[in-house]
């Protein structure tokens, strides 16, 4: 993807996948390209993040597990010669309450993406989001 986003023509010949010279347009507005974020909780995901991505997107991780993962991510990044601070963590799928969100931020998340229940009307959804905002931003 990085080659497609940054080069006029790109090709790839690897062990598992090949593609001939191709062009891809339009090019991303973000330079050099949009952030690449990998999700997952597999044992090797943190190494993949260090090797290929700009961030990690774990789903509903506990603060304790996140703290452990952040330390491991920092260790792997340092070994690879990367600045650990260049790798973001965006936890998603969380309940939108202060007692859930704040411990995740304290444990090393750069951002927490909340999940909300669906409402039937725009007014109901607005009311819910205003309550969430009042709880989180005080």
Language-model segments: which ranges?
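Active-site-adjacent structural elements that line small-molecule/cofactor binding pockets in enzymes
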Residues: 1-138
């Amino acid at each position: 993807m990085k080659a497609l986003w940054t080069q006029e023509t790109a090709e790839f010949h690897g062990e598992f996948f090949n593609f001939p010279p191709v062009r891809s347009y339009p090019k991303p507005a973000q330079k050099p390209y949009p952030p690449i974020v990998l999700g997952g909780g597999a044992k090797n995901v943190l190494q993949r993040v260090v090797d290929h991505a700009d961030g990690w997107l774990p789903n509903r991780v506990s603060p304790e597990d996140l703290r452990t993962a952040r330390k491991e991510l920092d260790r792997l990044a340092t070994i690879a010669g990367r600045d650990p601070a260049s790798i973001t963590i965006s936890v998603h799928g969380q309940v939108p309450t202060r007692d859930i969100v704040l411990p995740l931020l304290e444990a090393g998340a750069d951002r927490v993406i909340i999940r909300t229940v669906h409402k039937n009307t725009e007014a109901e959804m607005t009311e819910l989001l205003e309550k969430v905002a009042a709880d989180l931003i005080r």
